[in-house]
UniProtKB/Swiss-Prot annotation:
EC number from the UniProt entry: 3.1.-.-
Similarity remark: Belongs to the endoribonuclease YbeY family.
Binding site for Zn(2+): H114, H118, H124
Cofactor note: Binds 1 zinc ion.
Protein name: Endoribonuclease YbeY
Biological function: Single strand-specific metallo-endoribonuclease involved in late-stage 70S ribosome quality control and in maturation of the 3' terminus of the 16S rRNA.
Primary location recorded for the protein, binned into one broad class: cytoplasm
NCBIfam families assigned to the protein according to its UniProt record, in alphabetical order: rRNA maturation RNase YbeY
Length: 159
């Protein structure tokens, strides 16, 4: 039986209205068990200032972003279930949900799925990688009862 260990950190000044820990756990469990038996992930919910600072430091982009993924890379001789950290910006997730005409819950779920796939080594820099990752995200989201997260883009509602 697979196991997903979640360390949830709320660093947002307003914790009201955030998804519950069980929601984050469920979203991780929708992704990770198909890739490895035991997984440990830290999810840190932050405000725009921290997101902007981290995005600028690690990606050279001076603006907040929806999710940052920091994969853990253990030395080859050390086997640990730690996948890494997801840093998710509450305000950006809520703003994007409104812009993309999604429920906030749906977009939170998508950001957890998207970030988890980055922790597993998926990327979307090249078009072919993006297509593979987006197809996998869609499959996972639909398996959890959510709509295709890229439907708005496909329908021309967003960039």
């Amino acid at each position: 039986m697979s196991q997903v260990i979640l360390d949830l950190q709320i660093a947002s000044e307003q914790a009201q209205g955030l998804p519950e820990e069980k929601d984050f756990q469920r979203w991780l469990e929708g992704v990770l068990p198909q890739f490895q038996e035991v997984s440990e992930v830290t999810i840190r919910i932050v405000d725009e200032a921290e997101s902007r600072d981290l995005n600028n430091t690690y990606r050279g982009k001076d603006k907040p972003t929806n999710v940052l993924s920091f994969p853990f890379e253990a030395p080859p001789e050390v086997e640990l279930p730690l996948l890494g950290d997801l840093i998710i910006c509450r305000q950006v997730v809520e703003q994007e949900a409104a812009e993309q005409e999604k429920t906030v819950e749906e977009h939170w779920a998508h950001m957890v799925v998207h970030g988890s796939l980055h922790l597993l080594g998926y990327d979307h820099i090249e078009d072919s990688e993006a297509e593979e990752m987006e197809a996998l995200e869609t499959e996972i989201m639909q398996s959890m009862g959510y709509a295709d997260p890229y439907l708005a883009e496909k329908d021309g509602l967003t960039e």
